[in-house]
Amino acid sequence: MDAATPDCTSKCRSLKHALDVLSVVTKGSESQIKSFLARYCYNAATVKDAFGRNAGHLASSCGKKGVLDWLIEKGVDLLVKDKESGWTALHRSVFYGHIDCVWSLLKHGVSLYMQDKEGLSPLDLLMKDRPTHVVFKDTDPTEVYTWGDNTNFTLGHGSQNSKHHPELLDLFSRSGVYVKQVVLCKFHSVFLSQKGQVYTCGHGRGGRLGHGDEQTCLVPRLVEGLSGHNCSQVAAAKDHTVVLTDDGCVYTFGLNMFHQLGIIPPPASCNVPRQIQAKYLKGRTIIGVAAGRFHTVLWTREAVYTLGLNGGQLGHLLDPNGEKCVTTPRQVSALHHKDIAVSLVAASDGATVCVTTRGDIYLLADYQCKKMATKQLNLKKVLVSGGCMEYKVDPEHLTENGGQKICVLAMDGAGRVFCWRSISSSLKQCRWAYPRQVSISDIALNRNEILFVTQDGEGFKGKWFEDKRKNSEKKADILPNLHHSSSDVSCVPDTNSVYERIRLEKLPFAHRAVSVSTDPSGCNFAILQSDPKTSLYEIPVVSSSSFFEEFGKLLRETDEMDSFHDVTFQVGNRHFPAHKYILAVRSDFFQKLFLSDGSSLELTDVYQKDEDAAGCHLFVVEKVHPDLFEYLLQFMYTDTCDLLTHGFKPRMIVKRKAEDCEGSPDSHLHTVNCHVDDKQKSAFEVYRSNQAHTLSERQKSKPKSSKKGKGVGDDDPVRMLQSVAKKFGLSNLSSRLEGVRLENEKINVIAKKTGNKLKLSQKKCSFLYDVTMKSVDGKEFSCHKCVLCARLEYFHSMLSRSWIEASSCAALEMPIQSEILKVILDYLYTDEAVVIKESQNVDFVCSVLVVADQLLITRLKEICEVALTENLTLKNAAMLLEFAALYNAGQLKLSCLQFIGLNMAALLEARSLDVLSEDVLKDLSIFYRKMIPAMERRVITPYQDGPDISSMQVEDGEVFFKEEINMEPNYSETMFKKAKTRAKKKPRKRSDSSGGYTLSDVIQSPPSAGLLKSAKTNSVESLPELLTSDSEGSYAGVASPRDLQSPDFTAGFHSDKVEGKAKPYVNGIPPPCTREDVKPWEKSPTTKSAPQFIPSNRVDTAASSSWLAGSCSPVSPPVVDLRTIMETEENRQKYGAAPKSNLGKIISHGIKLSQKQRKMIALTTKENNSGTNSMEAILTAPSKSPKPANAWAPLHSPLSRSFRDFLLEEKKPVPGYGSGDHVKKVCFKGTENSPALNVARCSTHGTPGLESNHVSDFPLLDSPNPWQSSSLAASPAVAPVTFASIVEEERQQEAALIRSREKPLALIQVEEHAIQDLLVFYEAFGNPEEFVVVERAPQGPLAVPMWNKHGC
């Protein structure tokens, strides 16, 4: 375990190694497993245990896809089988339900058809694991799959291309047509739907398609002549078609060359369906039809009728008069017996087979009726092929000794198949030469082979083993194929055997088959498979509508000062702001009112007065109580009101005499509220309650008579509201109030009536349009603001007063296509999405769902989920699952997961899961294991013995480090794009005191190679880490990323991270007090929360001091007077031309100095270069300082010292430093305006007490506002330059030279890409007003390059 290399060779076959490897695979994590395998055994990928299992078998069984992929890269043999059951890794991953591992194996070429010792392939295991409720029946909705050579367009795919495996006939699936029977012929095909409709395609010569013409149809087309009949069975041959309806009528069409249509007089052809006259059937009901090339067969329970060319297959003798054809249906006399009841009939070109209910099988051929077998009870299907006809009957179409041998197949209810062949003349049971047992549910027969469908939905193709005596040369080929056959199948066929031996071959892409058919020649095939959604029960559900609740909320939240209402009603002393569109749609009265502006109405109780506080129309409504008008509005908005609610207790409204109505607007109405405390009553309600007491005493004298008479509704609020509803044209409300009574001061709904619900239309009331939506493609939609705001919070926020869209007169541009925007608006108005429900375009519905998800229209999103589930197919299931996972469509995702789980075999065989991401594949695996109940018991218990890997970490294996550093060539570019995208999603924000910075600050400041770094941090960031860092506070510069170091600003600002040491300053600035620094009884001078610092990967001193100072300062900079500003400007001009200090030296980009050095140099440069543009920083003095000192005072150069002095200086501490003081070394880099970057080496003392007492106020550097400036801080003492800093500088210059030589091409390309993006962003090309140049910053000093001579 601890050895660096394994103790074996590449040919290791150690059984102990194998056991240890398998033990670790079962109990370790993926990282531990890979680390162990890389160190433990050279042959860990292929070593096997005693059962033949390797690491790949166990990894796929445990679902550890990462280990499996790693083993595949190491060359593990994926096709190796274990010794116990012959399972491959694919068998095991399927058995344990790890679909992600299955897909990984399939991508590396593992076959799905490899069989184990029991003859089961991985597809068979999937079929065996199918849930028990999934059963395929012929009554299920079925889809048609066809394949073959397609010579005559008989497959219906719209082209003449051949199909090598079953393909869906999507015409029926798109139109929702389910087919229950398919008949394939040489020149055409007939399809019978479950609804009784007939479709045909192929060559139409002679009218065999029944469309009224002889045109060729490439795809199935409905036979219009039979659309009014419910057809139950179809039969067809080479030139004609026979159709049987539910009522026993028979229709035929096509060529009538042999009088097989049964039409009198016989035409040459018939291109539309025509009925066979019932008089020839003696009033009996036809229950079945069959057809051959030369004849047609009809049968009832009692008799069989044939017609057509009599070549011996009709069951009739030769006509003595020489008539070759039977024109009308004629009963077969040999089967005319009282004990014969016909159950099944089949026909071929030269033979007819009949089966009776007693189990007798009759063959009509050679002008005879032969009994082939007896007592074959419970037969479900019979088929016949071949046959020979008398060529003298029609020498033009028949040849002497023509035809094929007769073969008859019969299947009983138990799934047994019996075969009768003319070469053996005996009925034999078929036995299958297949490694496992199959149960047959349907059969089809052609001249060369048999097709089968099993009860499990599988499809097979079978062929007979040829006779040994005639095909002895093929014996060598036959014997290997029977090697894995069941024990009851002998390898050598014998004509005297009681079984007919059939060799089976599985059909691909047949997993839900219920029926199969073939043409007589065996060139084209069709198979009916159950609809893949048949067993799906996870169907999305649309939540209940909140349409009325949203409008009710709009009514409740509307006030006179909002920007949404456009009309106000004054009723009594109350004002009701409302929306014209809703009132106009609900009432013709209000529509006329708004059209006429209240000037030409006959009703004088409503008139326009003036404008309300928001400038909207104000209407006065008289002789209506405010409560009644409130109920009225409530009904118009929500389609209901309180007086329609059973059990509601309304307030009693009493009307006084008419002469009392001339006073105030409310003087004629009094209300008694017996259900509210006096403290909750308004003054008006108390007044009405006092007046009601007197009225109640007057009515005590005749309480009974008060309930009768003319004024019965005067004190009933229900009747009063009904009267008001009629007055305002709300007949719907009036009719619904008919079934409402007020009993015992409560509402009693006697008869609940439902009227026309609230229906809104975008096209109604066009004169009230107040907002216009404009789509991306330029189409405009006029809408009503109140509907948009009520239905969607997005529009409510957009159209509020605080946004420009609310006051803009221009159309609102929506980033949505017009088709999608129309669906959104229709939903907002009608609460329905008819277009979505009827749409077959999955992409369009997905686009609507995306927009609905963005706009948070949950119910429309659910409608889209339902529509997508209805259109779920095997082709789009994986795509929709990935789509649902991406847009958080939970119900759609669940439906897709179950759909894929139910059809896992078909989707894996079709390779349809390649669009799924790894996360979705993992979710699919989890769901699949939960869906199969047996998966709970299929768990591999981790092996207890074996090596202990509990202490093993990821770093233990060298292979991981190599994998991580070996990036793809385009990886850096990909990460740069991701970082750019993330930066767009997170825009920078800046406030006066947040300390942030804008994009212009980043672009104008020069890129720096050095980083502020704590003493603890020595890590180097890779290029992907730099490019994917947060966009706030960091950006990718142009220098090499190898010299970038991980920043850690928290070390200088959080005392809990640096224990026992004083906090290091950044740029000589004391850090702010954190919450731990402030005592509980002292009031902090800062705000409640300390500012958060933004980490940066590339910060120069000028820029960093600016934003760091801003981030540290919780208050705004002080405002100084004009004199101070003038003095400051004078000092700048005075010292601007001063010579630079001797300490100024050029420093290269990328030099790595310690944090102390950088701080020290930066502070010194502030003092020396104050007149230049390289640094202008003003520090506020501590509160204890009596007056500010001049920060621009000239700095005295340090005295010259010897080498010994430098050594002694480093050994002894600097005088004047306390125990908590530190020497700060700062590396400063100038701005882009300076021609060269300076280096200053100095040592500074921190000011004692600054950190513990208060937080200094730091202004933003180089503020454009001259009125905002800060006081000047005193300059700290200068520290001597150490020898170590000189050595460090030389080392960094050498490192800079190496970096410049080894700069990777990928980084250079990133820089060039960034330069081009900046040029485009600042519109540098063709700009006559500005000259914009973007170039790399100078690298700075490098070490002198040395070229060594080699080979001397």
From Swiss-Prot:
Residues 565-645, 769-837 form the BTB domain. RCC1 repeats lie at residues 141-194, 195-246, 248-301. Residues 993-1002, 1084-1094 have a biased composition (Polar residues). It is a peripheral membrane protein. GO terms for cellular component: cytoplasm; membrane; nucleoplasm. The modification Phosphoserine is found at S991, S1005, S1031, S1034, S1040, S1046, S1055, S1084, S1111, S1113, S1116. Keywords: ANK repeat, Cytoplasm, Membrane, Phosphoprotein, Repeat. Residues 701-710, 977-989 have a biased composition (Basic residues). Disulfide bonds: none annotated. It is found in: Cytoplasm; Membrane. One of its GO terms (molecular function) is protein tyrosine kinase inhibitor activity. It comes from the Eukaryota. ANK repeats lie at residues 51-80, 85-114. Residues 692-716, 976-1002, 1032-1094 are annotated as: Disordered. GO terms for biological process: release of sequestered calcium ion into cytosol. InterPro entries: Ankyrin_rpt (IPR002110), Ankyrin_rpt-contain_sf (IPR036770), BTB/POZ_dom (IPR000210), RCC1/BLIP-II (IPR009091), Reg_chr_condens (IPR000408), Signaling_Regulatory_Domain (IPR051625), SKP1/BTB/POZ_sf (IPR011333). Interacts with the PH domain of BTK. Acts as an inhibitor of BTK tyrosine kinase activity, thereby playing a role in B-cell development. Down-regulates BTK kinase activity, leading to interference with BTK-mediated calcium mobilization and NF-kappa-B-driven transcription. This is Inhibitor of Bruton tyrosine kinase.
